[in-house]
Amino acid sequence: MDPDYKSRKEAFVSNLTGGSILEINAVTLVAPASVFLWSVLQSRLSFFTPYGPAALITDFLLNVLAILFATTFYSSAPWLLNLLLVSPAFLILMNSRSRRTQTKAKPPQTATAQHGPGASLPIHPFLTTYRAAMMIITCIAILAVDFRVFPRRFAKAENWGTSLMDLGVGSFVFSGGVVSARSVLKSRERGASPKKTLTQRFTSSVRHSVPLLVLGLVRLYSVKNLDYAEHVTEYGVHWNFFFTLGFLPPFVELFEGIATLIPSYEVLSLAVAVLYQVALESTDLKSYILVSPRGPDLLSKNREGVFSFLGYLAIFLAGRATGMRIIPGGISPSNTPQQARKRVLTRYGANIPVSRRLANMPYVLWVAAFNNAQLFLFCLIETILFPSVHRASGSGKNDEAKRTDFATSPILTAFNRGGLAVFLVANLLTGAVNLTVPTLDVDKTRAMAILVGYAALITGVALGLNKANIKISL
């Protein structure tokens, strides 16, 4: 890469301060709004059954391109885009309620009831939707941020501040924590069987982390050898997000032993966040991370990645705490005290600036509060428009699969099932585009054409993997 252009690229994503949380909420609300319109079309008109070309294109427009437009063309008017999405949904609801009430989500009457291990852990379409929407906006943002059509206030803040991409990084980790609760719940259901020792669990988690750590090494090698533009203050000289993701499972297993003494992942998450924040405020750790010169040792060169890992660990544990509550039976009124606690903690942490670079306590609380709100919205949409998903607890697995398939976008299902592979492809395509296209000098029309093509390609990869029944999720 040309040295002058590389310097311009690095300056383009440096020293940014982010934007307002209200605007971030408005932009991210596009995902639930799109799912709301999709759900109305499906529950009232069965528009996506069968899933032909028209259904595929509409699905792509609603669940992928709407998010792309929210972060580009409609970045200055996200509320307008939300209105454009929900208005037709309400019109359909008003005109079809009486005619479609009895058929909007009628469960099939074929399979017999099944019981056994895992029967109390139903499939939740809203969890699939939530994780897939997060994956889509992440994949879009990692390439869009290199174009001028993507507002700078959405890019990662340098030291302090809130931005869309700052939230995306934490949400990626939080969602991983949510789904990790399923394995914990299943192991607790099998209480009679011999439990694995800490060493066995730790070894197993390391094996699962190896692919992510390998990807981290591949990315490190590629960036250094291709002279790719890099933002060193993001994670450090050698560290990258794949390393953070890869080291989380083994460290979480170490906390699993503590969970027997403190049987609350909420408390564990908060304890990690608070202790880390105390260290930041009462020692020189904060200034060491933010302003100290980089020494020759590995810790100094990668201090952002190493120490922010503690914040991401707290976020992962917070996600697992949420998963432990919602996976067994969805979101219910009994879970509202948890929401109240998070609101109180968010207000308490508001006196300290949010820092994604530090992954400090306010950042942890912001990410947890946002993701709980998103889960609530997706669950609310599902509960209202697909009530049969939450009924017939004694029906068989075949019935459950048919009901969940009816209530879930095929594109969102594909992104959720192929999460790791899609994220890898998105990173490879982002690198390829940046090495072949002068993204800083591209006009808006060409930038949007590239981004739409990129979105279509990663969607095609996700659908192809799902069609081949290949599951490589994060």
UniProtKB/Swiss-Prot annotation:
- The gene it comes from is gwt1
Function in brief: Probable acetyltransferase, which acetylates the inositol ring of phosphatidylinositol during biosynthesis of GPI-anchor.
Where does it localize? Endoplasmic reticulum membrane
Q: Which Cys-Cys disulphide bridges does the record give?
A: none
Its placement in the membrane is given as: Multi-pass membrane protein
- Tell me which EC number(s) this protein carries: 2.3.-.-
According to UniProt, the name of this protein is: GPI-anchored wall transfer protein 1
Q: Sorted alphabetically, which InterPro entries does this protein's record hold?
A: PIGW/GWT1
What pathway or pathways are given for this protein in its record?
Glycolipid biosynthesis; glycosylphosphatidylinositol-anchor biosynthesis
Q: Does the keyword Glycoprotein apply?
A: yes
Glycosylation: which residues? 15
Keywords in alphabetical order, please.
Acyltransferase, Endoplasmic reticulum, Glycoprotein, GPI-anchor biosynthesis, Membrane, Transferase, Transmembrane, Transmembrane helix
